[in-house]
Every structure is written in structure tokens, then in C-alpha cells.
Regions:
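Flexible "cap/lid" subdomain of the alpha/beta-hydrolase fold that forms the substrate-access gate
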Residues: 2-20, 28-29, 68, 75-111, ...
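Conserved HGGG/HGGXW glycine-rich cap/lid loop of the alpha/beta-hydrolase fold
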Residues: 30-79
């Protein structure tokens, strides 16, 4: 596995958010951390990064949590795993390994957005005693999502990119033109939002 460089964009002095590193589940993870207290593990979605949580982290810290937002495997500055494994089950194992490495206990909370939501569901299913609360946003549990695909054409339209990424063409398209595809997704999904801070 290799650590990939990233331009760290947060002004740590202004936010009380710091960048840390830990090795868990055979991968080196960089993560943002704010506050002390019970662990609140924040799993980002796609095309987001851990910086997505920068506005929520100080609020969680003020509520008595140690908010930790890892850059998920393959997202700079975390490592790119040599096995290329990004399945939900592996991401769930990452979350439980991070829980252990970061000193989590049975009062810990896990929050996942988008791609991070199935990972947090999986982590809770694999090790329910680790998590007091599980919060999934923007993506329902797998069975409900499957039913939505069967019953709701609009959901299939909104989820086109999930199917696109299953094809080898995605590797070519996503990296082309300095990742213009990712910028296009940001413009489409969040009109008017300046995503340069998050990329």
C-alpha cells in the first residue's frame, strides 16, 4: 500500500481540527480529529472526503464527543490498498478496526453519509456491541435500496453512477482531464457549491 500526498486545506488553528494517522485493518489511515470524549466515527461518501465533516466536527466536540473523520481507504492522504479492495464488507472492517485502534468503547457512535452509510451499517452488523448509535444518511440499508431499485425508476436514475463504476470504463473516465468527471458530479449534485475545498 502507498500513502498518497494531499494538500491539507483546513486551517487547524481556526477549527481545532487536527490531522492524525493510524494503521488499522492493514491500511494506513489519515483522519481528522476534534474534541475529546466518546468516539464519534464519521465515514464520508463519494466524491467527498473526510473534510465533508469539518462543519459538524466542532459541534460534536462541543457536545462531548471525540469526532474522528477518516479519509477512507484509497482517499488521499490515506493509503491506497495494494489489493484494491473497496467492497462494503472491507470498509465495515476498516470502521471496526478504527474503533479499536482509536480506543472506542460500547458508547461509540458511527455516522455514515452516502458511500459511508452502508459501511456504518456493516460495521454495526459485524460488531453491534461496539456502537451505541448508528446513523446512516442518504443511502438506506441494502435491502431497502434494492427494493427502491425494483419499485422506483427515479431511484435507478439517481443511482446511475453506482452502476457506471462497476464497469472498467469508469477507471478511464474518472481520471481523464484532471478528474473533470468528479467536478461534473459536484456541479450536478451540489449546484453553486465550491467543491475545491473538498477535492
Amino acid at each position: 500500500m502507498t500513502l498518497v500526498p494531499v494538500k491539507y486545506l483546513l486551517d487547524v488553528a481556526d477549527t481545532n481540527i487536527k490531522l492524525e494517522c493510524v494503521s488499522a485493518n492493514g491500511t494506513d489511515f489519515s483522519y481528522l480529529e476534534c474534541g475529546s470524549g466518546k468516539l464519534a466515527l464519521l465515514l464520508h461518501g463519494f466524491p467527498d472526503t473526510a473534510q465533508t465533516w469539518r462543519h459538524l466536527m466542532p459541534q460534536l466536540a462541543a457536545a462531548g464527543y471525540r469526532a474522528v473523520a477518516p479519509f477512507m481507504r484509497g482517499y488521499a492522504p490515506s493509503a491506497v490498498p495494494s489489493d484494491g479492495c473497496y467492497q462494503t464488507a472491507m470498509l465495515a472492517r476498516d470502521a471496526n478496526a478504527l474503533h479499536e485502534k482509536l480506543g472506542g468503547d460500547s458508547e461509540s457512535v458511527i455516522i455514515g453519509h452516502d458511500w459511508g452509510a452502508p459501511s456504518c451499517y456493516g460495521a454495526a452488523i459485524d460488531a453491534p456491541s461496539r456502537w451505541r448509535q448508528v446513523v446512516g444518511m442518504a443511502v438506506p440499508p441494502t435491502a431497502a435500496l434494492g427494493m427502491a431499485f425494483v419499485q422506483n425508476l427515479e431511484q435507478i436514475k439517481k443511482s446511475w453512477y453506482m452502476f457506471f463504476f462497476q464497469h472498467g470504463l469508469a477507471d478511464l473516465v474518472v481520471g481523464a482531464n484532471n478528474h473533470a468527471f468528479i467536478e461534473m458530479l459536484w456541479r450536478d449534485w451540489s449546484p453553486g457549491y465550491d467543491a475545491s475545498f473538498d477535492l
